[in-house]
């Protein structure tokens, strides 16, 4: 339905150029390459004489079909993605340059046989840093319009899941292909830099108990809402409770049933039920709870911290949490949301008027490096937990891949 509406509007407006902001790793039932299909459908509609320019996420799974049907594809150069508007502006600038100068662009593409986790793709010291730096060096060469290395998204079971490189030039396409091949080889050489150590939960619990005066943050990357996780995973919280850990603050668990129960009962009431673990059996069990409803909230909450200059591109973007219930068990305060939402770019406790300093342990879903930015005013010992879920940084433990090209590291080789 989305595709049909887009095509109808494009046909109605008869544009001189089509600008798109696509993620690049979308998955739709019935289409292995839905964004390639979308671009090819738009190209068939507007014809070869109407250019198509698109901006893609750094974690796009770029396919040859996408490259074939777009005149220019630009990837974000940052993780966290703070250059969205900048890359969109560059797209328009390149179009105007092409109109004025009349150059013809040629694009090459390469994809190494890799599947890399997203957890360490930070471009400010993380594994993607040298790739972006190399791309900028190549862009200094005469005739090079753009070089975009993509980390890919490992949670999509599609043929072209994984890292790739696009290079667009005004010289011979062989120049672009040489650049793509070079960066592809660098991906292969540096592949292990993307994989991180995951802390076993029994060791995390032992560490917390051995130094109880410190504050800890346990990151649940395996249930990352921005990566397709259901955000109702309970595995880490379950283990911490079982291990006797107290003063836990949890951000967040999505559970519409518990939220409805809390709002029906009201603040101060005691509720009993099963929390989380209801979307599937991949992120932990539904937890039996007896809890006091301590807060009920219905208000807009920003996607990013208002004072976070690095997230200025997101502007006044608000996330639809739906209704929010904060419930308290003997061992944990849990932020329960009606809708699945990301919280890695904000301190959700502050927005709910909760002092997170009162917690000894925070359990946070999403990227650890983003949380470190938003909790930088506090001294935490950070752990990325060895947990379970569809965003497991150990890509061999995500599940069965049926569509991805083979062989691919690390699924098939060491």
Language-model features and meaning:
Residues 1-8, 162, 166, 173, ...:
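N-terminal glycine-rich anion-binding loop in soluble enzyme alpha/beta folds
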Residues 2-13, 203-207:
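Short, charged beta->alpha transition segments
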Residues 3, 12-98, 220-237, 241, ...:
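Active-site histidine-anchored catalytic micro-motif
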Residues 4, 188, 305-414:
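Extended hydrophobic packing segments that form well-structured cores
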Residues 14-17, 213-214, 359:
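Short acidic/histidine-rich motifs immediately flanking catalytic phosphotransfer sites
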Residues 77-81, 275-278, 387-389:
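Short, acidic/turn-prone active-site loops that include or flank metal/cofactor-
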Residues 88, 92, 96-136:
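Conserved anion/nucleotide-ligand pocket segment
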Residues 119-330, 335, 339:
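Hard-cation-handling environments
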